[in-house]
């Protein structure tokens, strides 16, 4: 008796769950026929405005292009192999528009970059225990790593 009740209740749930025709994809059901016709008319209008590629080019141009496709490819320009030698313009940096690097120039550049990194706001933080906001709270309340009471 209980299996009959379960079967009947399951069938009732199915009947009330799917009252009409079932569709495989309900997204397409939300598009009306009028919308589809408007879309089709829009596509037809667009096709009328844009000429086909074959109509845009005269037949003579198309035949010339077909002949070029059938022709063998032109060989690339010959580039001499690299011998491993550097010419003076490349050695002096003339090819890149820069002069040679001196040791003093390099050290001055590195020192200026190091100063810029040390002067950055993150480097100026006095405490590594808390973030910036916690440092301000810690300084006023006496909490934190850098709390000094006077």
UniProtKB/Swiss-Prot annotation:
<dbReference type="GO" id="GO:0007168">
    <property type="term" value="P:receptor guanylyl cyclase signaling pathway"/>
</dbReference>
<keyword id="KW-0372">Hormone</keyword>
<feature type="site" description="Cleavage; by MME">
    <location>
        <begin position="129"/>
        <end position="130"/>
    </location>
</feature>
<dbReference type="GO" id="GO:0043204">
    <property type="term" value="C:perikaryon"/>
</dbReference>
<keyword id="KW-0597">Phosphoprotein</keyword>
<dbReference type="GO" id="GO:0007565">
    <property type="term" value="P:female pregnancy"/>
</dbReference>
<dbReference type="GO" id="GO:0008217">
    <property type="term" value="P:regulation of blood pressure"/>
</dbReference>
<dbReference type="InterPro" id="IPR002407">
    <property type="entry name" value="Natriuretic_peptide_atrial"/>
</dbReference>
<dbReference type="GO" id="GO:0007218">
    <property type="term" value="P:neuropeptide signaling pathway"/>
</dbReference>
<dbReference type="GO" id="GO:0051427">
    <property type="term" value="F:hormone receptor binding"/>
</dbReference>
<feature type="signal peptide">
    <location>
        <begin position="1"/>
        <end position="24"/>
    </location>
</feature>
<feature type="disulfide bond">
    <location>
        <begin position="129"/>
        <end position="145"/>
    </location>
</feature>
<dbReference type="GO" id="GO:0005737">
    <property type="term" value="C:cytoplasm"/>
</dbReference>
<keyword id="KW-0732">Signal</keyword>
<feature type="modified residue" description="Phosphoserine">
    <location>
        <position position="128"/>
    </location>
</feature>
<dbReference type="Pfam" id="PF00212">
    <property type="entry name" value="ANP"/>
</dbReference>
<protein>
    <recommendedName>
        <fullName>Natriuretic peptides A</fullName>
    </recommendedName>
</protein>
<dbReference type="GO" id="GO:0005615">
    <property type="term" value="C:extracellular space"/>
</dbReference>
<keyword id="KW-0964">Secreted</keyword>
<feature type="propeptide">
    <location>
        <begin position="25"/>
        <end position="122"/>
    </location>
</feature>
<dbReference type="GO" id="GO:0003085">
    <property type="term" value="P:negative regulation of systemic arterial blood pressure"/>
</dbReference>
<dbReference type="InterPro" id="IPR000663">
    <property type="entry name" value="Natr_peptide"/>
</dbReference>
<feature type="propeptide">
    <location>
        <begin position="92"/>
        <end position="102"/>
    </location>
</feature>
<dbReference type="GO" id="GO:0019934">
    <property type="term" value="P:cGMP-mediated signaling"/>
</dbReference>
<dbReference type="GO" id="GO:0005179">
    <property type="term" value="F:hormone activity"/>
</dbReference>
<dbReference type="GO" id="GO:0042311">
    <property type="term" value="P:vasodilation"/>
</dbReference>
<dbReference type="InterPro" id="IPR050787">
    <property type="entry name" value="Natriuretic_peptide"/>
</dbReference>
<keyword id="KW-0840">Vasodilator</keyword>
<dbReference type="GO" id="GO:0006182">
    <property type="term" value="P:cGMP biosynthetic process"/>
</dbReference>
<feature type="region of interest" description="Disordered">
    <location>
        <begin position="77"/>
        <end position="100"/>
    </location>
</feature>
<feature type="site" description="Cleavage; by CORIN">
    <location>
        <begin position="122"/>
        <end position="123"/>
    </location>
</feature>
<dbReference type="GO" id="GO:0042995">
    <property type="term" value="C:cell projection"/>
</dbReference>
<keyword id="KW-0838">Vasoactive</keyword>
<keyword id="KW-0966">Cell projection</keyword>
<dbReference type="InterPro" id="IPR030480">
    <property type="entry name" value="Natr_peptide_CS"/>
</dbReference>
<keyword id="KW-1015">Disulfide bond</keyword>
<comment type="similarity">
    <text>Belongs to the natriuretic peptide family.</text>
</comment>
């Amino acid at each position: 008796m209980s299996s009959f009740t379960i079967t009947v209740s399951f069938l009732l749930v199915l009947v009330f769950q799917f009252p009409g025709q079932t569709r495989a994809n309900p997204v397409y059901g939300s598009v009306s026929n009028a919308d589809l016709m408007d879309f089709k008319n829009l596509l037809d209008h667009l096709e009328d405005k844009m000429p086909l590629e074959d109509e845009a080019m005269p037949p003579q141009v198309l035949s010339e292009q077909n002949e070029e496709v059938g022709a063998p490819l032109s060989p690339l320009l010959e580039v001499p192999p690299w011998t491993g030698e550097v010419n003076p313009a490349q050695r002096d940096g003339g090819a890149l528009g820069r002069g040679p690097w001196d040791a003093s120039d390099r050290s001055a550049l590195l020192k200026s970059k190091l100063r810029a990194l040390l002067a950055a706001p993150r480097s100026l933080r006095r405490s590594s225990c808390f973030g910036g906001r916690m440092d301000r709270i810690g300084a006023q309340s006496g909490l934190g790593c850098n709390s000094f009471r006077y």
